[in-house]
Structures are given as structure tokens and as C-alpha cells.
Amino acid sequence: MRTNPTTSSSVVSTLEEKNLGRIAQIIGPVLDVVFPPGKMPNIYNALVVEGRDTVGQQINVTCEVQQLLGNNRVRAVAMSATDGLMRGMEVIDTGAPLSVPVGGATLGRIFNVLGEPVDNLGPVDTRTTSPIHRSAPAFIQLDTKLSIFETGIKVVDLLAPYRRGGKIGLFGGAGVGKTVLIMELINNIAKAHGGVSVFGGVGERTREGNDLYMEMKESGVINEKNIAESKVALVYGQMNEPPGARMRVGLTALTMAEYFRDVNEQDVLLFIDNIFRFVQAGSEVSALLGRMPSAVGYQPTLSTEMGSLQERITSTKEGSITSIQAVYVPADDLTDPAPATTFAHLDATTVLSRVLAAKGIYPAVDPLDSTSTMLQPRIVGEEHYETAQRVKQTSQRYKELQDIIAILGLDELSEEDRLTVARARKIERFLSQPFFVAEVFTGSPGKYVGLAETIRGFQLILSGELDGLPEQAFYLVGNIDEATAKAMNLEVESKLKK
């Protein structure tokens, strides 16, 4: 960690002696630069090209050294468009890797891969910066205790609990509630854990990034009037950016998250959307650098690149980084090297279902497809484990009976199966929950439900104590007491109508 100005030009101006090179070759986003003998920059050093193009436009391109070619030449990958660059232009070696601003001043702001604000709200009020390339925490620094990261979302905490300092894969198509779930997690970690969040948009659509920013402002996750009260920092490397920017934007977001963990000693949520785009950008850079492709055309260093990112996402004795990563599966092929490499690092998967979303059950988390390595009796306890297993068994039996119900109707089922269906429908509805960030859209106040309350609620449904209550009483409520109160209100309303 060091303190210095954040812009590339001011970093350069503070260097006592500039190490200057010249561009020898430009191949799209890749530059070959010649330096004087004995003054070669190190791998991952940031190089800056400043000057004017043929029509007098100012050029300021930052590159990262990727290869030392010999004959005093290095090969670097540009972090922005190389339009206007020419052979012979002067290149300055900054003598250090890319550094980005960190700390509380980053909250509520949008950054690019270089840590420059792109939200037209002026410069960032911090002089503390950190290099994006760092080693993962040493083994002795790690907190190896297995503990649950409580989210306050019933379906997640009960059936696919997150690990503190773990990595979660978020699977879901368009329009099933990924963004709302992400925003609720950001909101809940701030309220329940006093934590903050960092969102890394890796190779995503500009429109989606803009929509997320607008929705965060609307729901209060980003506070426009008092930016210091915001709960999230956003880092975007969009689809139209060069591959170098898309490959490094995940590291920029992670570096900001590491500061909150290591210096502020906070619990941090790190969102990466989409982890596949990180791999894709690495593949493009690998091809541009002339490396021999590996399986399915991916880079030969796929596992190393993924590991260097994922191993920095962990719990230490100071705090934790819990990462939620959207995973795109190319052609729905789970054996593709990109998702297959990602799966090796995941502790839990949260699968969003379009069928549940169509029924109006939000969050539309599929209780049967979502998994977690934390759902073991020795970690969560016998009571939690038994309740979760019984909920899954009841839901699975209901799923098996749906074809029979569709053809023959409920009346043809046995008494036991009818009871199972009734309880499964109550469970399905009780897995829904009103969100704080959706208050402005639904008018229903959001609910944070503790794990103990969640377990108690499902135990009461499974035991049959609530068999007499109507299933609509369980829809979009917090804890089980609210469902009981809602049932009484429904009964009063029905009597008044009569």
C-alpha cells in the first residue's frame, strides 16, 4: 500500500528519472516497445504513451508489460484503444504495476480498469493507491474456520448457505432477478455485517452496467445526496473495451475489496459479472501474444490465471472477501474448460429458475438445483441439516407428483401425497421473501430473516402444525409469525366479504 496521486500522468511526473522507450510495432491492442540497454521494465509494469496524434488530439494510453522479447524489446497490452499511436512515439516506464485508488472514497463511484472515475462526479478524494498485482494471503494469515455467511435471505441461508470468505456461482438467464438478488445482498451485508461491496463488471454490456447503476441509485444502495453513505464501489470494463482492460478489471475490483478487508478489517462482498468474460479476455490476449492455444482454443495458462484471481478471494484474520460470480456456460456445456475451471473454485451455487420467476416467487432460487459444500451436519449443525434435507425431499416429491396432478388432478393422489403437496406448496411460497431494494417497486417493506427464525419456520410447516393455514398466507412474508398473522387477516377479510 502506498500513497501517491492516482492518475497515470502524475505518477510519471513524480518519478525522479524517467525510463523512456519508443514504440517499434503496433498490432491492434499490442505494442512492441524498445528500451535502452540495461533499462528493461519488469513484467506487469505499467507503461504510459503520451502525445498527440496526426490531427492534434491528445493521446494518453496505459499499457501493461506482458513479455520480454530480447534485443531490448518488450511486448505490452494496451488498457484502452490504440487509435492514433505511431511507431517512434515515446513510451514512459512508470517503474511499477498499475495502481488504483482504494478506501472509503471509492464507495458510490464508478471506475474503469485504471481506477479513473467515469461517472462525471469529479476526482476521487483519496491519495491512497494499491497495485492490482499482489500475492494471495500467506497460509498463516488465513482464517481456516468454516463459518456460515448469513445473508438474511431464507432460501439461501437454509438450502445453499454461503461460506464466509467463500466463492459462490450465480446461474441465471435474463429477467429472473439476478440484479435484484445482487442488490439485496449488497444491502444486507451493509446492514447486518457493517460490510461493503465491490461490483466488478467484467466484459458486460454497457446498457446492463448503466441499468445496475440507475437501479442502485433508485433503491438507495448508492446515495446520491450523501455519496459517503453508499454501500458499493463499481468497476466496469465493458464489452467494447480492449481485451487487456477486460482481463484486468477483475483485479482492479479485487484490489479495492482487499483494502476494505485488510486495512478496514471489514466483511466484503465482491461481485464479478461475468467470470467467463475474464477467461475470454485472457484467451484473446494470449492469442495476441502468440502463445500456442490449449483445449478448445483457450489460453494454455487458463488454470494459472483463474487461480491467481480466485486465491486472493479468501478470509483472513482481519476480515473476509465473499465473492459472488455470475457464470456464463457456453452452449450449456458444463465440460467447457472455462466453466469447468471456475467450478473447481466454487463453494456454493445459486441457480435462478425461470419457472419460479414465472410463478411470481422471488427470489426465484431453485431449491433443488442450488448446492453448497457448507450444508453438512458438522458445519451447520444437525437441526439445520435435517430441516434442509426434509425441505428438499418434500420439494422433490412434489416435483415428481406434478405430472400426475396435471393429468389426473389432486383427488387421485393418496392421502399422504396430498398432504406432501399441500406442505410443499406452503414451503415454495415461504421460500419467497420481500426485499428491501424492491420496496420502491412493490410497496411491501423488506424483511431480513435470521437463520434461527428461518429454521423454526420450516420446521413448523414440516411438522404439520400449520396445515390448517391457507398457502397464500406464506407468500412474500418474513418469518413464520408474519405468515400466521397474515392467515388471521385473510380469515377476517373473508368473513367480512361474506
Curated annotation (Swiss-Prot):
Entry-linked SUPFAM superfamilies: C-terminal domain of alpha and beta subunits of F1 ATP synthase (SSF47917), N-terminal domain of alpha and beta subunits of F1 ATP synthase (SSF50615), P-loop containing nucleoside triphosphate hydrolases (SSF52540)
Gene that produces this protein: atpB
Chief localization: plastid
Protein's UniProt name: ATP synthase subunit beta, chloroplastic
Taxonomic source organism: Calamus usitatus
One GO cellular component term noted in the UniProt record for this chain: proton-transporting ATP synthase complex
Biological function: Produces ATP from ADP in the presence of a proton gradient across the membrane. The catalytic sites are hosted primarily by the beta subunits.
Location in the cell: Plastid, Chloroplast thylakoid membrane
Classification of source organism: Eukaryota, Viridiplantae, Streptophyta, Embryophyta, Tracheophyta
Top enzyme class: translocase
HAMAP family: ATP_synth_beta_bact
Annotated ATP binding sites: G172, G173, A174, G175, V176, G177, K178, T179
GO BP field: proton motive force-driven mitochondrial ATP synthesis
PROSITE patterns per record: ATPASE_ALPHA_BETA
Family: Belongs to the ATPase alpha/beta chains family.
The keyword Chloroplast belongs to this UniProt entry's keyword annotation: yes
Transmembrane helix keyword on record: no
